[in-house]
Amino acid sequence: MSCPVIELTQQLIRRPSLSPYDAGCQALLIERLQAIGFTVERMDFADTQNFWAWRGQGETLAFAGHTDVVPPGDADRWINPPFEPTIRDGMLFGRGAADMKGSLAAMVVAAERFVAQHPNHTGRLAFLITSDEEASAHNGTVKVVEALMARNERLDYCLVGEPSSIEVVGDVVKNGRRGSLTCNLTIHGVQGHVAYPHLADNPVHRAAPFLNELVAIEWDQGNEFFPATSMQIANIQAGTGSNNVIPGELFVQFNFRFSTELTDEMIKAQVLALLEKHQLRYTVDWWLSGQPFLTARGKLVDAVVNAVEHYNEIKPQLLTTGGTSDGRFIARMGAQVVELGPVNATIHKINECVNAADLQLLARMYQRIMEQLVA
């Protein structure tokens, strides 16, 4: 199958860019963008490679994505080696095919076609690419955004190429994401012998009523755009492994995926009040991974919906479900942010794959979005 989108996707898959290492992917993208007149600024931080590229001036539409991938797992369980792209029955297999090297290829090819047809486009077309999205995300998009904001860089619209679709390309478009807040909580007791409980203080017993009340809380009911806030306990650890020792500490880690009905400070206050109510001795550490954001109907959402309807003849759902994405950082710039990418059924799995025809379709959608916003 000869198609510039498929060929570029295959070239990217062959580069084993395990997060946060880029493995030469960005050099390939930069070469293609510079060839059509983009100015490229590398913005590397620690072991992470990033670049910001732009062409033209004025109202700015950026395409954002990541070159890094998650580990492939047991390579013997793949139908072909994970970094050797293979097409079978119209499906392109390889780590990163759907998340998100296919999107990157579609973006670049769309830009090439757009520039060829609109060499003097009236707005500015940009790319924000990182190699640190799948791992810590500490030195990736967030650092680039901070640098761009420090110099008052303009960003009006941003399309993130995350695999948003469920069954066919464009059936779901993400126009926002929930916030993510993690609590690392240690309940302190007194270690002792299980035969002498009066000489100890069991933190597991102490914490049980608190945890029961915590999991029963209805945090909110969501709203028109967001599902209700959810809280899930992810890890609990206590004890020495011995059956005759009362533990001295209990560690509990729980995560909130929260809507715009709450702030992280509201959640923290409610948890701390509950700890005090149960008279627990504790230490607590919070990690805010991202605030919730929402892009209401406007020029970007309308352009994306138009592109999907034009090429796939379906009306996309606008959803905010799922995990976090780098869109949470880009939204800080005041930009309208939307995610549109391929079907996500196999992301992070053994035998990750994407319909090759979907990538060709995605490139056409991306080009139509460019034409509506910056031509």
UniProtKB/Swiss-Prot annotation:
Catalytic activity: N-succinyl-(2S,6S)-2,6-diaminopimelate + H2O = (2S,6S)-2,6-diaminopimelate + succinate
Single GO biological process annotation from the record: lysine biosynthetic process via diaminopimelate
Name by which UniProt lists this protein: Succinyl-diaminopimelate desuccinylase
PROSITE patterns for this protein: ARGE_DAPE_CPG2_1, ARGE_DAPE_CPG2_2
HAMAP family from the UniProt entry: DapE
First and last residue of the signal peptide: none
NCBIfam families: dapE_proteo (TIGR01246), PRK13009.1 (NF009557)
Family annotation (Gene3D superfamilies): Zn peptidases
Domain of life where this protein originates: Bacteria
Lineage: Bacteria, Pseudomonadati, Pseudomonadota, Gammaproteobacteria, Enterobacterales
Enzyme nomenclature, EC number: 3.5.1.18
Pathway(s) this gene product operates in, as recorded in its UniProt entry: Amino-acid biosynthesis; L-lysine biosynthesis via DAP pathway; LL-2,6-diaminopimelate from (S)-tetrahydrodipicolinate (succinylase route): step 3/3
InterPro entries: ArgE/DapE_CS, Bact_exopeptidase_dim_dom, DapE_proteobac, Peptidase_M20, Peptidase_M20_dimer, Peptidase_M20A
Annotated residues for binding of Zn(2+) 1: H66, D99, E162
Summary of the function given for this chain in its UniProt record: Catalyzes the hydrolysis of N-succinyl-L,L-diaminopimelic acid (SDAP), forming succinate and LL-2,6-diaminopimelate (DAP), an intermediate involved in the bacterial biosynthesis of lysine and meso-diaminopimelic acid, an essential component of bacterial cell walls.
Record's cofactor remark: Binds 2 Zn(2+) or Co(2+) ions per subunit.
Binding site for Zn(2+) 2: D99, E134, H348
Family membership: Belongs to the peptidase M20A family. DapE subfamily.
